Amino acid sequence: MAPAWSLLLALLLLSCNAICSLGCHLPHSHSLAKRRVLTLLRQLRRVSPSSCLQDRNDFAFPQEALGGSQLQKAQAISVLHEVTQHTFQLFSTEGSAAVWDESLLDRLRTALDQQLTDLQACLRQEEGLPGAPLLKEDSSLAVRKYFHRLTLYLQEKRHSPCAWEVVRAQVMRAFSSSTNLQERFRRKD
């Protein structure tokens, strides 16, 4: 358990440093909100992942949307916004309230909302720059389709605790990938 916690902490620290280099000035509260989101997602785990092995599924995570070499900074911010928005919507459903503690979900939604606010301000700033490309439609569509597959899976599994555990792990993967995207841009700067 300690190595997993150490890895999570390392990803969080990378994220905090990396987000500041995306070309806009996100407040320190954004870094704290990202840290809170990952911590809260970890705390949501109520079912042992090993007991849900039969529920695993390949949701075809759109890694190319987060890792394409042609992705510009403004596009990266748009992808991060898209992932955060869909995560907020996913954990705002009635099905999520039936599985997890409402207080914990409220804290998660508050942290996600803070991230959305920061990213929206950043998007407005980036859109004002001359020649700033907007999100490629295929990246946006790939993220939307991914979250749609997660939603359909939850419906198919009738929002079972194991289904939510699988989805929770997928969302953590998406946030980890967004951290990697942020780190890639930090290294370029």
From Swiss-Prot:
Disulfide bonds join C24-C122, C52-C162. It is found in: Secreted. Pfam families: Interferon (PF00143). It comes from the Eukaryota. SUPFAM superfamilies: 4-helical cytokines. One of its GO terms (cellular component) is extracellular space. PANTHER family: INTERFERON ALPHA-5, TYPE I INTERFERON. This is Interferon alpha-1.
